[in-house]
UniProtKB/Swiss-Prot annotation:
UniProt function note: Catalyzes the attachment of alanine to tRNA(Ala) in a two-step reaction: alanine is first activated by ATP to form Ala-AMP and then transferred to the acceptor end of tRNA(Ala). Also edits incorrectly charged Ser-tRNA(Ala) and Gly-tRNA(Ala) via its editing domain.
Entry remark concerning the domains of this protein: Consists of three domains; the N-terminal catalytic domain, the editing domain and the C-terminal C-Ala domain. The editing domain removes incorrectly charged amino acids, while the C-Ala domain, along with tRNA(Ala), serves as a bridge to cooperatively bring together the editing and aminoacylation centers thus stimulating deacylation of misacylated tRNAs.
Enzyme Commission identifier(s): 6.1.1.7
UniProt cofactor note: Binds 1 zinc ion per subunit.
Native organism: Mycoplasma mycoides subsp. mycoides SC (strain CCUG 32753 / NCTC 10114 / PG1)
Catalytic activity field: tRNA(Ala) + L-alanine + ATP = L-alanyl-tRNA(Ala) + AMP + diphosphate
Protein name (Swiss-Prot/TrEMBL): Alanine--tRNA ligase
Biological process, per Gene Ontology: alanyl-tRNA aminoacylation
Gene3D superfamilies, per the entry: 2.40.30.130, 3.10.310.40, Bira Bifunctional Protein, Domain 2, Threonyl-trna Synthetase, Chain A, domain 2
Length: 896
């Protein structure tokens, strides 16, 4: 058999399908786009769902890709099994309404067995099919000529792909026989037929024949358009072609494992031979190496795609991977942060197909290092907690084990091993049940979100062509109505209702790429319609949601008028988004990556990833860079070209969270901003007019949202509003100060107020006045305390001559009832009296117009016999409500 590297395997796969007229889809981000049902891209087909359900038209009915994916539903198995990973790469070929079973099987067989490609021995391949899928069985037997003893007809459990609702169908799987050396019990093909986990017969390819729609109640209807969805794990192929015991000895992971060995000062070694001659201690060591090698790869890719360690969702998964790796690193004697030193190894092995990782190296290293160092402190607390549990209990409970697992990153194996050293047991079964409940809660939180949309016949058949003309115009006469529908029903005529309309040509922009949809009107002699919304259809038609007054019919000619003012201000903001993206990358570095945006006529916001919150000075610098480009009056340039040309020739920023067509549109401003974009933009930067950053907020670990405004009108309105808010706050502070300045004067507070009052309204002074106001609040906080202390002191002056008298127990006691003291005053008076007299009990009551207050205090010297809380609770003649301790009790009272 050929010995192939991972890069060679991937290339042979993609080149083969490209030669068979498949369109190559670039790998996309691990972060799903417009799919709340998924936390991660978890398969090769997950990125293609809109093509399969008909919401979008694919660039070709034949597709191929190599897609990175993450699955973490059983993360605890990583490092234990031979082929389980958090991140994996799935090779795929897909047919959307083109070829079906026969050609899919023939293509797979040719790639696997032809000497020009993988050249695998045909006799080493075994096949499974769904037991009711006679068609697939006969293709393998009669067309491919597979021996019948190499074909297994299995149940729905293993050979029918169904997620409960939407496209589904039978599948066929291809297995490679690695030989008897991997089958120590000599079970043979029954390992396949009985679906027994094994290392002899490796599943290399799964081909799903998507031919039914499940309505959600297990009623199956033939799809109007049948599809092929296949997946083949690259890591498994690598293990086969490199003849390794597990995936971890392949060129994907083994260089990282060798690097970890160096970081242990070679005190610990990974043993390949341990597979055949297992040793419990070495198996545990191997597991540690595997976990680290697997988790660091997933972490590098996730952070590069914009996921940062955090406390929820994707961020929590990455935090958990880092923490789990740290724990296993400690098992290998590594006590310092070390994972960040492995980033280079991961990038080196993956950069040929993922060159963008190179630019992310510094960001990824710094992010991992920061997270490691924070966790190492937590980890030591985890060890302390476990040691305390072991000292005080005979068993580590299920709840304690889960706490150690989730909050401190302790794998259950780690807890068991440490506990066993002290002959303490762990409630493993209880832990597993609690862990499953936690997982189920996560699943339930997402279960109502459909994993696959039911294939919509209306959209799959929606082939009418429509041209968007709005890049160069905002009005059009004699546009033709070519399609109308309502409630998923096609209509020919509509009167005084809302309807969805497609025109042959339209100037109305459909919401996409972060830009809001246009609004406006359409009209002719028979009707007037208000365009409420515009969304894009599966083949790029702009679908207008229109409230019709009068009657509108298919084939009518209408006049279109876009709301020009809304469009103009939206254009300013969209171009402003490109400007601030450029400026942030210029100020903070190219590790800044846009992860979403929205712009309409009212402003813009942009989400971006970065390892920390930018400083005010950095934001001001970015703002000034944008203003400089506006002042320089730079023309916009627009190009239509291939994705490859857009990057190579125009240095356009292409975002891995987006999917692009074969021909893309590049928007350039000078030599500083070049992005793929389908939106509307100003012709010259001067048309943006003005620019200001109005705020920034964290949207999660490593993700920030910046908000901005453009145009003279919007910026001036914002400045006037903000200055009024700040000056009103300053006015409120000084008004309160003026009420008390006869009691205590503060020149600093008065001076700051005058500076705020006299500050001129402009962008440069916005930060100045904000800082002055913050300074004023700090000074006022200190001033208020001093004034309140003075007021209290003055109120307490008339009680300075209080003296104790002996109570019935011959103990010094001061009892006072008054009407002018609040609870704070009473506590201060009690402290003053205890400081003045020794061995004293103080009982103070005050009845104001609004409330009653009581404070009881006891000198420390008496607290062995008299406790403030006891006196408080048993005060003769009063019902008290409150709390306290031996020293002091406080609350409210009612006379009996």
């Amino acid at each position: 058999m050929k010995k192939l590297s991972t890069n060679q395997i991937r290339k042979i796969w993609l080149d083969f399908f490209i030669s068979k007229n498949h369109y190559f889809l670039e790998t996309v981000s691990l972060i799903p786009v417009d799919d709340p049902s998924l936390l991660w891209i978890n398969s090769g087909v997950a990125t293609l769902k809109p093509y399969f359900d008909g919401r979008k038209t694919p660039p070709s009915p034949r597709l191929t890709n190599s897609q990175k994916a993450i699955r973490t539903n059983d993360i605890e198995n990583v490092g234990v099994t031979a082929r389980h990973h958090t991140m994996f790469e799935m090779l795929g070929n897909f047919s959307i309404g083109d070829y079906f079973k026969k050609e899919a099987i023939e293509l797979a067989w040719e790639l696997l067995t032809d000497k020009k490609y993988f050249d695998i021995d045909k006799n080493k391949l075994y096949i499974t099919v769904f037991n009711e899928d006679t068609e697939a069985y006969n293709i393998w037997k009669d067309v491919i000529k597979i021996d019948e003893d190499h074909i297994f007809r299995l149940s729905r459990k293993t050979n029918f792909w169904d997620v409960g609702q939407g496209p589904c169908g039978p599948n066929t799987e291809i297995f490679y026989d690695r030989g008897e050396i991997w089958d120590p019990n000599k079970i043979g093909p029954r390992l396949i037929s009985d679906d027994i986990e094994n290392d002899r017969y490796i599943e290399v390819w799964n081909i799903v024949f998507s031919q039914f729609n499940n309505d959600g109640n297990n009623n199956y209807v033939e799809l109007p358009r049948k599809n092929i969805d296949t997946g083949a794990g690259l890591e498994r192929f690598a293990s086969i072609f490199q003849n390794t015991p597990t995936n971890f000895e392949t060129d994907i992971f083994y260089p990282t494992i060798k690097k970890v060995e160096q970081l242990t000062n070679n005190q610990f070694k990974y043993s390949i031979d341990n597979y055949f001659n297992p040793n419990k201690k070495q198996t545990r060591i191997n597991t540690a190496f595997k976990v680290i090698a697997d988790h660091i790869r997933a972490t590098v890719f996730a952070i590069s795609d914009g996921v940062f360690p955090g406390n929820k969702d994707r961020g929590y998964i990455i935090r958990r991977l880092i923490r789990r790796s740290c724990v296993f690193g400690k098992e290998l004697g590594i006590k310092q942060a070390f994972l960040y030193k492995l980033v280079d190894s991961v990038i080196e092995s993956m950069k040929e197909f993922y060159p963008y990782l190179i630019d992310k190296k510094t960001l990824v290293e710094q992010t991992i290092k920061d997270e490691e160092e924070k966790f190492l402190k937590t980890l030591s607390k985890g060890y302390d907690l476990l040691e305390n549990i072991i000292k005080t209990k005979n068993t580590v409970s299920d709840k304690d084990a889960l706490l150690l697992f989730e909050s401190y990153g302790f794998p259950i194996e780690q807890t068991i091993e440490i506990s066993e050293l002290s002959n303490v047991t762990v409630d493993v079964e209880g832990f597993k049940k609690l862990l499953e409940q936690t997982k189920q809660a996560t699943r339930n939180a997402r279960k109502d979100l459909k994993a696959w949309d039911k294939q919509n016949e209306l959209f799959t058949k929606l082939k009418v062509e429509s041209e968007f003309t709005g890049w160069s115009e905002t009005s059009r006469d004699n546009a033709k109505v070519i399609y109308m529908f309502t409630d998923q029903k096609q209509v020919e005529s509509i009167t005084n209702q809302e309807v969805f309309v497609i025109l042959d040509k339209t100037p109305f922009y459909a919401e996409k790429g972060g830009q809001a949809a246009d609004s406006g009107i359409i009209f002719n002699d028979q009707m007037k319609g208000f365009v409420i919304d515009v969304q894009q259809g599966p083949t790029h038609q702009n679908i207008h949601r229109i409230k019709v007054q009068g009657t509108l019919k298919v084939n009518d000619l209408i006049n279109c008028r876009v709301d020009e003012e809304k469009r103009i201000y939206t254009m300013k903001n969209h171009s402003g988004t490109h400007m601030i993206h450029y400026a942030l990358r210029e100020v903070l570095g190219t590790s800044v990556m846009q992860s979403g945006s929205y712009n309409d006529e009212n402003g813009l916001r942009m989400d971006f990833t970065y390892h920390r919150l930018p400083t005010n000075q950095e934001l001001l610098k970015a703002q000034n860079l944008v203003l400089e480009k506006i002042k320089n009056k730079i023309d916009r340039q627009t190009y239509f070209c291939s994705l490859e040309e857009s990057v190579k020739k125009h240095q356009a920023l292409a975002f891995f969270t987006e999917k692009y067509d074969q021909i893309v549109r590049v928007i350039k401003f000078g030599d500083f901003s070049s992005e793929l974009c389908g939106g509307t933009h100003v012709n010259n930067t001067s048309e943006i007019e003005d620019f200001i950053i109005t705020g920034i907020e964290s949207k999660g670990s490593g993700l920030y949202r910046i908000k901005c405004l453009t145009s003279f009108r919007a910026v001036n309105e914002y400045l006037n509003e903000q200055f009024k808010v700040y000056k009103d706050q300053a006015e409120s502070i000084i008004d309160k100060y003026n009420q008390n300045k006869d009691l205590l004067k503060n020149d600093q507070l008065e001076n700051i107020y005058l500076q705020i009052k006299n500050t001129t309204i402009n962008k440069d002074n916005l930060l100045v006045i904000k800082n002055l106001l913050d300074q004023s609040k700090e000074v006022n906080k200190d001033y208020d305390k001093k004034v309140n202390d003075l007021i209290t002191a003055n109120k307490l002056l008339k009680y300075k001559d209080l003296t104790p008298s002996l109570n019935k127990d011959n103990i010094n006691e001061i009892r006072l009832e008054t009407t002018d003291l609040n609870i704070k005053d009473l506590k201060q008076l009690a402290d003053d009296l205890r400081n003045k007299y020794n061995d004293l009990i103080v009982i103070l009551l005050s009845s104001t117009n609004e409330n009653t207050f009581i404070v009881v205090a006891v000198s420390q010297s008496l607290q062995n016999k008299y406790k403030a809380i006891d006196i408080f609770n048993n005060l003769e003649g009063y019902e008290t409500k409150g709390g306290g301790n031996a020293n002091l009790a406080q609350g409210k009272f009612v006379k009996k």
